[in-house]
Amino acid sequence: MATFMTEDFLLKNDIARTLYHKYAAPMPIYDFHCHLSPQEIADDRRFDNLGQIWLEGDHYKWRALRSAGVDESLITGKETSDYEKYMAWANTVPKTLGNPLYHWTHLELRRPFGITGTLFGPDTAESIWTQCNEKLATPAFSARGIMQQMNVRMVGTTDDPIDSLEYHRQIAADDSIDIEVAPSWRPDKVFKIELDGFVDYLGKLEAAADVSITRFDDLRQALTRRLDHFAACGCLASDHGIETLRFAPVPDDAQLDAILGKRLAGETLSELEIAQFTTAVLVWLGRQYAARGWVMQLHIGAIRNNNTRMFRLLGPDTGFDSIGDNNISWALSRLLDSMDVTNELPKTILYCLNPRDNEVLATMIGNFQGPGIAGKVQFGSGWWFNDQKDGMLRQLEQLSQMGLLSQFVGMLTDSRSFLSYTRHEYFRRILCNLLGQWAQDGEIPDDEAMLSRMVQDICFNNAQRYFTIK
C-alpha cells in the first residue's frame, strides 16, 4: 500500500521521479495569470494567522465549506474570528477526500510551512495552527517572503483599465524586490455592454482617460490612453472573461455610434447589437495587443453569480459560479479570423471551463499559428474546475494528440492566495508522471536529455520566452 503524500507523490515510476526531482522541481515559477493583490506585494503584507492567509478570499474552500453544511458566518462572516473559520475548515478537510482541496491543503502545509507526515483535521488543527502562526510571524513568511521561498520569478496580476497601477510602479521602483510583477489588462467591463453597470463604468473610464465618451471613436481614444498607461507600467498580457462568446461582423462607426448612443440613453439593445459591439471592441483590442506584443488570454464559458440571494449578500467572486454549456467553436473561429485576416492576431491563449470544449480549442489553435513564435496560439492549462488531476491530464493529453505539447506555456495559479504556488508543483508532478508512463510503456523514447528539456520548457522556459518575445 502506498503512503499518502511522500516526496514521490503522484510519481509512479523511476522515469517520472527522475524527471520531477531532477528537472521540474528546481525550475522557477512564471505565474503569468493570477488574482493576487499588487498592494499586498508592494506592502509585503504580513499575515496574522493561518486562518487569514488560508481562507481569506479563497472561494474554492468556501464552496467546500458550504457543501459540508457550514454556516455562512464561519465562511465569510465578519462577526466570527479567523480561528473560528479555521476550525470550521479543519472539520471540513477530512470530508474532502477525492477533491483536489485535500491534496492542495496538504501540499500547502508541506510548502512553505514544512509540515509533513501529519493529516490535517480537527485532531491536529491546534498544533498546526501554533506551528504555522510562529512561522507567519517571521519575515520569511511575509507575502514576498513566501513568493521567494517558492522560487517565483514573475507574476501577472489582473487589473482593470481604470486602475492607477500605483502599486506596480512602487514595486518596479523598489530594488529590494527581485520578482517581476506585471499588470494584465482585463477590459471585461468595457466590452460587456449589456451589463447593468456599463454606463456607470464608462463614466469612470472617462475620468481615468480624461476623454468624454459619446461615440465609438471616443471609446477607442480612451482605451488607447489607458493601454499606453499599462504599457508604461510593464504590461505583457490581457485577459478577458467571456461567459457567452458572441460574434457578428463589425459594422461601420455610424452603426457603432448608434448602438453606444442607445445604451447611454438607457434603451435595451438587441442580441445582434450586443454581438456587434462586443465583436468590435474585442477585434479592435486584439489588434492593439498585436501591435504592442502583448498576449491575449480568453477565458471562455463560466456562468457567474448563479445565486441571486448570495450575490446580493456577498457580491461577485464568492463561490457561486459554475460551468456553462454554450457552443463556442463558430464564434471563436470567426473572432480569431477577424484579427488574423489582416495579420493582426496577437499571441493568444484560449481556456475553456467546459471540458467538452477541450478538443475544440486543441484543434482551433492549429488554424492560427504563425512563423517566428512557437505556439503562437495556445490551448491553456486546465482552468478553475479543471485545475485538478483529471482535468490537467485531459488537457495535456488532448493538446499532445492535436498540437505540440512541447511548446505549451504550462501552469498558472489563477489564484488570490499566496499559498497557491503548490499548484505548480501539483501540475509538474502530473506532467512528469504522464511522460514517465508514456516512456515506460514504450510510447515515447526513454531519453533523459529529450524528456528533461521538454519538462523544463513546459515548467518555465516556454512561458518566459512567450511572454517576453515581441
UniProtKB/Swiss-Prot annotation:
InterPro entries found in the cross-reference section: Metal_Hydrolase, Uronate_isomerase
Superkingdom of origin: Bacteria
One GO biological process term: D-glucuronate catabolic process
EC number: 5.3.1.12
Disulfide bonds: none
Pathway: Carbohydrate metabolism; pentose and glucuronate interconversion
Reactions listed under catalytic activity: D-glucuronate = D-fructuronate; aldehydo-D-galacturonate = keto-D-tagaturonate
A Pfam family per the record: UxaC
Gene Ontology terms, MF aspect: glucuronate isomerase activity
Keywords: Isomerase
Stored PANTHER family: URONATE ISOMERASE
NCBIfam families with a match to the protein in the record: PRK02925.1
Family (UniProt): Belongs to the metallo-dependent hydrolases superfamily. Uronate isomerase family.
Protein name: Uronate isomerase
Organism: Salmonella heidelberg (strain SL476)
Lineage start: Bacteria, Pseudomonadati, Pseudomonadota, Gammaproteobacteria, Enterobacterales
Designated gene of the protein: uxaC
